Swiss-Prot record:
Binding site for ATP: G178, E179, S180, G181, A182, G183, K184, T185
Extra remark: The cardiac alpha isoform is a 'fast' ATPase myosin, while the beta isoform is a 'slow' ATPase.
Chain residue ranges for the region called Actin-binding: 657-679, 759-773
Organism: Homo sapiens
Basic and acidic residues bias spans: 1826-1837, 1925-1939
Record protein name field: Myosin-6
Length: 1939
């Protein structure tokens, strides 16, 4: 805009845009783009600098402060050239980066230009001062301006939203966001001001609203803001007028854009501010406005003073604000109430409740003595507040101190402490203020609601900005959460939806992730188990506190969510309990009192008093609040329940916020970003780090980037074509129908713009930023040029008319002057004087004769005039009828245009669907490629697995030798499995057959459809040929030779195309061979897959058998272990006996030592006893050794069997895994092969479709070629006719010239006669009179001829113009047909390789046409018969298609059943995965237990060593026993008793062995039963497998059984381990028993020593006993060795278990990985299969429908083309006739010119005769009398010529009648065409271009028809004129003859 245009903004211009001079100075400042840059700075973020040098990736620069810095090269950012200084749209910056945006805003802010565009949204910086940019002058200047036509402003954003609402018919919203103190409220007020100014309702509405002491609606909308600000705004740390509530103002408009109504929604009033403020803040403005003493009557009414410090609720912070005048604001608030229609009672109620809240804060309470209850400490303030609220003061105090609480069904009076009372007062004050505020909003909405119709709205959102204070509580969390949601909405709209729009429209676009997703923080707050959810949960628990809430927050989110952190508490600051990372920064929150704030409880006793208040407003506020009393009564009376009062603050806020977001999503948003320049509220100062932080958080840079990279402007194709066609009308011709998209493409490609700045979508054209503005400028410039040209032409035409009048005046004056001069020259002649004297006296007979002749001539002229009038009336009637027919045709054309538009819309819809389907196909192809890659990987794995499988087969052969015992069971189960596999194979074969049948049916279906299409094509072509033959029989008779020539040309083209056809057939054969090869490969793959499946099933059976064997061995091991335990118990008993005996032996040895000198008798007795004792001991030792040997053998056997079975299981598991992998790979290969086959089938179908389309095109080209040939023939015939007519006209012209020469000679003879009659005065007088009369008549005739000449010249010019136009059209038609023929031949040459066969068919059709010319009726009947046959075939094919559809549905049902079974197997697979995970945990437990067992083993080793040492000590003691033989006698009796006991113990051991054997037998029986049960279960499982009929189920079952076996084996190992630990414990007990027995034996030896002294006789026996004891020692040593062997075996077993555990862990990991892999593959394959099946079916159906409709439309379009060609032929005929008439006209004009020339010569001769002529006339009168007879003869000849000319005129009239007949024929043809076009209405969807060309041709024909009618009218008028002229000439000739 220039300075003159900026003058419209008045004083605001300098704050919106700098002057041209200042801008020019700024742009011409010195600037070096290579050195000017930005460098980072610690304090200022970025500073301007100049580059001094560059060294090794470092840059040395000098800042503008003179400081030299060295930075990395990638940290240096270029400055923009000076032309971009203070640019209004930052998206236009050359170098877009953070410092460029920052300094642009900073420089504009320094110049007080606070508004700046940033791509699609606007950025505004708070100026902290008043600027004159919002007055009415600025509003008027911005009204109706485009964004690019005016400087940035909030008014421009508002006007754009208003215009979008009117043009797009869509609701709009303006989101004004920013941090607290950024200026949101001011901008909101300006937006409302703008809408109220520009869209005000009419005068009637204003008068109506002005009634009842109210303002107009726009005034009420504006005044709602100060009323709400007084009660909802307050001073905060960052803002003196901060909105402490959010509001969404909806301004409703009518259909014409007039203001209709408005409403306001509010969110989250900060009610805690009513009772508490920080030091630097203050309460809501209304309190201080009331206390300003501007209205003293208010202070008296409210019983308050004007000192705020007298009231605790309003004096906790500051009480005054420098920038706010409370007294003036009070008057504004009061007047706003009046404008909004508040009654005086309502105003008084609002003020009273506000004053009562102030008194509430002054109420004092104290604690009763010796009680915790509170009592009032004075009642003055309570009395005041109760008075203002309409309550009883005593009831109020009682309700506060002793509220009634419902306990069960009874009410109890509860005592309150002082703290509780104060809290209750605060809660009541907050509730009263909040409800009063909400009531005010409702009341204002009721005022703003009008009954006028409303259609659209513009919403303005002003909500509390992001807040980070020193003390952040629950209110700050809610506010910040709201801002987080709004920022997320902005990000989603700007970055996600914008890019999704590009994808949806098919524009090539790479998705850009701007990293602006805030969903994590939002989920942390609002999702289940988020902060709000935990707060709600804690509010429901009665014993919950703030600390429990904190603990739950920490447990659920600390360390788990990145946005939740633990704060760092700093001394001197408020305590914080948790921190949240918001988009605008990290905020520390204090949770004290959150539970109470969320629940917001009220004293129900006081609330009940409120409901009964005498103040109407107070009772209204709490009428809907449900207390315990009202809740009970409500149940019986049907009143409102208490549920609403239980809704928490957080839940209510989230509900309102969700409603707001829903409303915003339904509108078109416009964003305004408000920025805080500094924290000090200093005008003109910008804090770079603060502003930079806000820009980063608000996504300003990202918004600019996507605006630059993306396409922010988009227009529908139809709208763009309609609006911008004026830029180049030639690109989109007026008479043609062109698709909107194609027209847009042509238009844009023809314009001189950057073609990379726009993209074409499916439905819209997309523009980069700035291009649409450039197009608008081009359009405005074009309009101005067009209007200027029109004005110039109009002025020129007016001046030409004026000039013509001036020339006419000049010519008239010249004629008058010439006549006067001639008269003056002859008036003094004697003869003239005599003539003047004699003329009045002469009354001769000549005059009478002349009068008679004149009368006769008048009669003739009158008759001709009547005839011409009758002829004219007839022609006028015909013209009226023709005009009527023309109008009818135009109406029909308009209807057809509407139908074509509908067809175009349907075609656009089909194109959209096609594009969507193509996208789906592309996606499916990508998935197919991924599957092929996976297939390649799986084939590689398959090869590896095959190698491993060969190795495993060898291992299996080795294992089969060890499994001879279970071979019988194996064979039995194998037979069963074989049966199952055979059945499964049978099922697979059935499925394969079904698939083959399905494919065959599909192919048959496709073939049937193709045949049907071919037959339909034949029917259509035959019907077309029939119509053509019926219409062109007459034409074909005269053009047989032309057709023969065309046929020869086509035959040559046919021979060319036949070779190409052979090539295409060979390629098709190659494709079919490839198809057969692929089918064979597919069959081989299926056979391999079946073989692999059978192998897998065999391996699975083998694994099951091995698992059964393992179970049996494990059961057997358990039985052996039980036997081993029994043996151990028996051995323990024997050991106990042995220890007793050894103890007795020691006692005997001691006694023997004491009785050393015993007798030999005693010695012998001792020997006998010793021998018996030794025998018993040997028996016992042998029994124990035998038991130990058997136990060791069993253990070893068990360990070996366990190891072997474990290895077998491992091998089988590996084999099974490999086979499963192979199976999955084969399945994937099978799927790939099937997909390839489907693709090949699709490709073949597409090729067939392409061939059919090309054949159709060849037919069309052939038809067009024939039409072009016929038109050329017509041109040649017309040319010959015109030549003959031209010759005839030339002959006529020569005759007319001869006639004119005769007339001239007659005139000369007359003049000679007059010279001869000089003497005869009377004759001379007669001659003079005759000459005078002739002069007058000649002059009259001259005038008439001049007029006729002018008319004829004009008509000639018109006819020449028409003729030139016709000639140009003929040339255009000729060139068009020639170029079309050339193009068509070129296209035929290009497509000849595919169209030979169709061309041959076309040639045959041509020959058939030539043959049918003679026998048309026979052909007609034959065609009808063929059509009937074809209809029968169509019905058959339809029946076949229906049967195929039925089979397809059955197959789909089978497929659905298989899918269901597969999903069941998937669920079982998931359960097996869970069990595998539980097994892994058990493995870890086993590992720990194993480590503990190793520790126990070490302890056992140490104890074993101790036992060996003790045994050596015992042997030494027994060696000394020989001295104690005497004492052995005493012990003998005891030993016998002990022997008996030992025998009984042995018997018990034998009994226990028998018992254990019985247990073994029972266990074997149970094992057999279990085995039978397992077999039965296996049989049931087999039956289930038979029912399942699927391969995946077997894989999952095998995995499940293997996992179960693993769990059981691990459990068995664990149990064995536990048993071993028990054995070791028992061994420890036995060792302790042995020690104890050794001690007792020592005592016995001491006692026996005394006996040995008495039995020295038995010393020899004692010696033998000593030897026996040595043998016992050897036996003990052997036992020790056995124990060591057992320990070693235990070690081996532990090692074996460890190996098996590791193998099991590895297998478990592999199994889990494979299970996960299979699960993921299965799920992905299932999803892909479902999608592909659904997409495939949809695609097939839609493609078939589209192809069918396309073919039908093409056929109909071809018919329309032929009809249009016929019309073109008729048009050419009409043009020939018009050309003929034009030539006739030229000839007539030439004759008229010659006649006029000769007439002029005669007049000159007559005028210049004078005296000489009179003398000559007198001399030659006699000569002329002689020549008169000859002249009469010549006159007779001229009469004959006249008759000839009349005959020619009759011929011309006949020719015009023929033209009329041609017109009627053309009209009939048009009528037929209209009928055909009506029949083609619904079938022209895929024939847009052809239909468009047809329509354009039709319009041209219609236009030419009109021109032909005009030319016919002109020709008729010319014929009439020629007749009139001929009559005049004949009359004159007769006159001359008579004279």
């Amino acid at each position: 805009m220039t300075d003159a245009q900026m003058a419209d903004f008045g004083a605001a211009a300098q704050y919106l845009r700098k002057s041209e001079k200042e801008r020019l100075e700024a742009q011409t400042r010195p600037f070096d783009i290579r050195t000017e840059c930005f460098v980072p700075d610690d304090k200022e973020e970025f500073v301007k600098a100049k580059i001094l040098s560059r060294e090794g990736g470092k840059v040395i620069a000098e800042t503008e402060n003179g400081k030299t810095v060295t930075v990395k090269e990638d940290q240096v950012l270029q400055q923009n050239p000076p032309k971009f200084d203070k640019i209004e749209d930052m998206a236009m910056l050359t170098f877009l980066h953070e410092p460029a945006v920052l300094f642009n805003l900073k420089e504009r802010y320094a110049a007080w230009m606070i508004y700046t565009y940033s791509g699609l949204f606007c950025v505004t910086v708070n100026p902290y001062k008043w600027l004159p940019v919002y007055n009415a002058e600025v509003v008027a200047a911005y009204r109706g301006k485009k964004r690019s036509e005016a400087p940035p402003h909030i008014f421009s954003i508002s006007d754009n939203a208003y215009q979008y609402m009117l043009t797009d018919r869509e609701n709009q919203s303006i989101l004004i966001t920013g941090e607290s103190g950024a200026g949101k409220t001011v901008n909101t007020k300006r937006v409302i001001q703008y809408f109220a100014s520009i869209a005000a309702i009419g005068d009637r509405g204003k008068k109506d609203n002005a009634n009842a002491n109210k303002g107009t609606l726009e005034d009420q909308i504006i005044q709602a803001n100060p009323a709400l600000e007084a009660f909802g705004n307050a001073k905060t740390v960052r803002n003196d007028n901060s909105s402490r509530f959010g509001k969404f103002i909806r301004i409703h408009f009518g259909a014409t854009g007039k203001l209709a109504s408005a409403d306001i929604e509010t969110y989250l009033l900060e009610k805690s501010r009513v009772i508490f403020q920080l030091k630097a803040e203050r309460n809501y403005h209304i309190f201080y406005q009331i206390l300003s003493n501007k209205k003293p009557e208010l202070l008296d009414m409210l019983l308050v003073t004007n000192n705020p410090y007298d009231y605790a609720f309003v004096s906790q912070g500051e009480v005054s604000v420098a920038s706010i005048d409370d007294s003036e604001e009070l008057m504004a608030t009061d007047s706003a109430f009046d404008v909004l229609g508040f009654t005086s009672e309502e105003k008084a109620g609002v003020y009273k409740l506000t004053g009562a809240i102030m008194h509430y804060g002054n109420m004092k309470f104290k604690q009763k003595q010796r009680e915790e209850q509170a009592e009032p400490d004075g009642t003055e303030d309570a009395d005041k507040s109760a008075y203002l609220m309409g309550l009883n003061s005593a009831d109020l105090l009682k309700g506060l101190c002793h509220p009634r609480v419902k306990v069960g069904n009874e009410y109890v009076t509860k005592g309150q402490s002082v703290q509780q009372v104060y809290y209750s007062i605060g809660a009541l004050a907050k509730a009263v203020y909040e409800k009063m505020f909400n009531w005010m909003v409702t009341r204002i909405n009721a005022t703003l609601e009008t009954k006028q119709p409303r259609q659209y709205f513009i919403g303005v959102l002003d909500i509390a900005g992001f807040e980070i204070f020193d003390f952040n509580s629950f209110e700050q969390l809610c506010i910040n959460f709201t801002n987080e949601k709004l920022q997320q909405f902005f990000n989603h709209h700007m970055f996600v939806l914008e890019q999704e729009e590009y994808k949806k429209e098919g524009i090539e676009w790479t998705f850009i992730d701007f990293g602006m997703d805030l969903q994590a923080c939002i989920d942390l707050i609002e999702k289940p188990m988020g902060i709000m959810s935990i707060l709600e949960e804690e509010c429901m628990f009665p014993k919950a506190t703030d600390m429990t809430f904190k603990a739950k927050l920490y447990d659920n989110h600390l360390g788990k969510s990145n946005n939740f952190q633990k704060p760092r508490n700093i001394k001197g600051k408020q305590e914080a309990h948790f921190s949240l990372i918001h988009y605008a920064g990290t905020v520390d929150y204090n949770i004290l009192g959150w539970l109470e704030k969320n629940k917001d409880p009220l004293n129900e006793t006081v609330v009940a008093l409120y409901q009964k208040s005498s103040l109407k407003l107070m009772a209204t506020l709490f009428s809907s609040y449900a207390t315990a009393d009202t809740g009970d009564s409500g149940k019986s009376k049907g009143g409102k329940k208490k549920g609403s009062s239980f809704q928490t603050v957080s839940a209510l806020h989230r509900e309102n916020l969700n409603k707001l977001m829903t409303n915003l999503r339904t509108t078109h948003p416009h964003f305004v970003r408000c920025i805080i320049p500094n924290e000090r509220k200093a005008p003109g100062v910008m804090d770079n780090p603060l502003v930079m932080h806000q820009l980063r958080c608000n996504g300003v840079l990202e918004g600019i980037r996507i605006c630059r990279k993306g396409f922010p402007n988009r227009i529908l194709y139809g709208d763009f074509r309609q609006r911008y066609r004026i830029l180049n009308p030639v690109a989109i011709p007026e008479g043609q129908f062109i698709d909107s998209r194609k027209g847009t493409e042509k238009l844009l490609s023809s314009l001189d713009i950057d073609h990379n700045q726009y993209k074409f979508g499916h439905t819209k054209v997309f523009f980069k930023a700035g291009l649409l503005g450039l197009l608008e400028e081009m359009r405005d410039e074009r309009l101005s040029r067009i209007i200027t040209r029109m004005q110039a032409q109009a002025r020129g035409q007016l001046m030409r008319i004026e000039f013509k009048k001036i020339v006419e005046r000049r010519d008239a004056l010249l004629v008058i002057q010439w006549n006067i001069r001639a008269f003056m020259g002859v008036k003094n002649w004697p003869w003239m004087k005599l003539y003047f004297k004699i003329k009045p006296l002469l009354k001769s007979a000549e005059t009478e004769k002349e009068m008679a002749t004149m009368k006769e001539e008048f009669g003739r002229i009158k008759e001709t005039l009547e005839k011409s009038e009758a002829r004219r009336k007839e022609l006028e009637e015909k013209m009226v009828s023709l005009l009527q027919e023309k109008n009818d045709l135009q109406l029909q054309v308009q209807a057809e245009q509407d139908n074509l538009n509908d067809a175009e819309e349907r075609c656009d819809q089909l194109i959209k669907n096609k594009i969507q389907l193509e996208a789906k196909v592309k996606e499916m192809n990508e998935r197919l490629e991924d599957e092929e890659e996976m297939n390649a990987e799986l084939t590689a794995k398959k090869r590896k697995l095959e190698d491993e499988c060969s190795e495993l087969k060898k291992d299996i052969d080795d294992l089969e030798l060890t499994l001879a015992k279970v071979e019988k069971e194996k064979h039995a189960t194998e037979n069963k499995v074989k049966n199952l596999t055979e059945e499964m194979a049978g099922l697979d074969e059935i499925i394969a057959k079904l698939t083959k049948e399905k494919k065959a049916l599909q192919e048959a279906h496709q073939q049937a459809l193709d045949d049907l299409q071919v037959e339909e094509d034949k029917v259509n072509s035959l019907s077309k040929s029939k119509v053509k033959l019926e219409q062109q029989v007459d034409d074909l008779e005269g053009s047989l030779e032309q057709e023969k020539k065309v046929r020869m040309d086509l035959e040559r083209a046919k021979r060319k195309l036949e070779g190409d056809l052979k090539l295409t057939q060979e390629s098709i054969m190659d494709l079919e061979n490839d198809k057969l090869q692929l089918e064979e490969k597919l069959k081989k793959k299926e056979f391999d897959i079946n073989q692999q499946n059978s192998k897998i099933e065999d391996e699975q059976v083998l694994a099951l058998q091995l698992q059964k064997k393992l179970k049996e061995n494990q059961a057997r091991i358990e039985e052996l272990e039980e036997e081993l335990e029994a043996e151990r118990t028996a051995r323990a008993k024997v050991e106990k006996l042995r220890s007793d005996l050894s103890r007795e032996l020691e006692e005997i040895s001691e006694r023997l030592e004491e009785a050393g000198g015993a007798t030999s008798v005693q010695i012998e007795m001792n020997k006998k006893r010793e021998a018996e004792f030794q025998k018993m001991r040997r028996d016992l030792e042998e029994a124990t050794l035998q038991h130990e040997a058997t136990a060791a053998a069993l253990r070893k056997k068990h360990a070996d069997s366990v190891a072997e079975l474990g290895e077998q299981i491992d091998n089988l598991q590996r084999v099974k895994q490999k086979l499963e992998k192979e199976k999955s790979e084969f399945k994937l290969e099978l799927d790939d092969v099937t997909s390839n086959m489907e693709q090949i089938i699709k490709a073949k179908a597409n090729l067939e479709k392409v061939s059919r389309t090309l054949e159709d095109q060849a037919n069309e080209y052939r038809v067009k070629l024939e039409e072009a040939q016929r038109s050329l023939n017509d041109f040649t015939t017309q040319r010959a006719k015109l030549q003959t007519e031209n010759g005839e006209l030339a002959r006529q012209l020569e005759e007319k010239e001869a006639l004119i020469s005769q007339l001239t000679r007659g005139k000369l003879s007359y003049t000679q006669q007059m010279e001869d009659l000089k003497r005869q005065l009377e004759e001379e007088g007669k001659a003079k009179n005759a000459l005078a009369h002739a002069l007058q008549s000649a002059r009259h005739d001259c005038d008439l001829l001049r007029e006729q000449y002018e008319e004829e010249t004009e008509a000639k010019a018109e006819l020449q113009r028409v003729l030139s136009k016709a000639n140009s059209e003929v040339a255009q038609w000729r060139t068009k047909y020639e170029t079309d023929a050339i193009q068509r031949t070129e296209e035929l040459e290009e497509a000849k390789k595919k169209l030979a066969q169709r061309l041959q068919d076309a040639e045959e059709a041509v020959e058939a046409v030539n043959a049918k010319c003679s026998s048309l009726e026979k052909t007609k009947h034959r065609l009808q018969n063929e059509i009937e046959d074809l209809m029968v075939d169509v019905e058959r094919s339809n029946a076949a298609a229906a049967a195929l559809d039925k089979k397809q549905r059955n197959f789909d049902k089978i497929l659905a059943e298989w899918k269901q079974k597969y999903e069941e197997s998937q669920s079982e697979l998931e359960s097996s995965q869970k069990e595998a995970r539980s097994l892994s945990t058990e493995l870890f437990k086993l590992k720990n237990a194993y480590e503990e067992s190793l520790e126990h083993l070490e302890t056992f080793k140490r104890e074993n060593k101790n036992l060996q040492e003790e045994i050596s000590d015992l042997t030494e003691q027994l060696g000394e026993g020989g001295k104690n033989v005497h004492e052995l006698e005493k012990v003998r009796k005891q030993l016998e008793v002990e022997k008996l006991e030992l025998q009984s113990a042995l018997e018990e051991a034998e009994a226990s062995l028998e018992h254990e054997e019985g247990k073994i037998l029972r266990a074997q029986l149970e094992f057999n039963q279990i085995k039978a049960e397992i077999e039965r279960k296996l049989a049931e499982k087999d039956e289930e497998m038979e029912q399942a009929k699927r391969n995946h189920q077997r894989v999952v079952d095998s995995l499940q059984t293997s996992l179960d076996a693993e769990t059981r084996s691990r459990n068995e190992v664990l149990r064995v381990k536990k048993k071993m630990e028990g054995d070791l414990n028992e061994m420890e007990i036995q060792l302790s028993h042995a020690n104890r027995m050794a001690a007792e034996a020592q005592k016995q030896v001491k006692s026996l020593q005394s006996l040995l002294k008495d039995t020295q006789i038995q010393l020899d026996d004692a010696v033998r006993a000593n030897d026996d004891l040595k043998e016992n020692i050897a036996i003990v040593e052997r036992r020790n060795n056995l124990l060591q062997a057992e320990l070693e075996e235990l070690r081996a077993v532990v090692e074996q278990t460890e190996r098996s555990r590791k193998l099991a862990e590895q297998e478990l990991i592999e199994t889990s990985e494979r299970v996960q892999l299979l699960h993921s593959q299965n799920t992905s394959l299932i999803n892909q299969k479902k999608k592909m099946e659904s997409d495939l079916t949809q695609l097939q159906s839609e493609v078939e429908e589209a192809v069918q409709e396309c073919r039908n439309a093409e056929e109909k379009a071809k018919k329309a083309i032929t009809d249009a060609a016929m019309m073109a032929e008729e048009l050419k005929k009409e043009q020939d006739t018009s050309a003929h008439l034009e030539r006739m006209k030229k000839n007539m004009e030439q004759t008229i010119k010659d006649l006029q020339h000769r007439l002029d010569e005669a007049e000159q001769i007559a005028l210049k005769g004078g005296k000489k002529q009179l003398q000559k006339l007198e001399a030659r009168v006699r000569e002329l009398e002689g020549e008169l007879e000859a002249e009469q003869k010549r006159n007779a000849e001229s009469v004959k010529g006249m008759r000839k000319s009349e005959r020619r005129i009759k011929e011309l009239t006949y020719q015009t009648e023929e033209d009329k007949k041609n017109l009627l024929r053309l009209q009939d043809l048009v009528d037929k065409l209209q009928l055909k076009v009506k029949a083609y209405k619904r079938q022209a969807e895929e024939a847009e271009e052809q239909a468009n060309t047809n329509l354009s041709k039709f319009r041209k024909v219609q236009h030419e028809l009109d021109e032909a009618e005009e030319r016919a009218d002109i020709a008729e008028s010319q014929v009439n004129k020629l007749r009139a002229k001929s009559r005049d000439i004949g009359a004159k000739q007769k006159m001359h003859d008579e004279e």
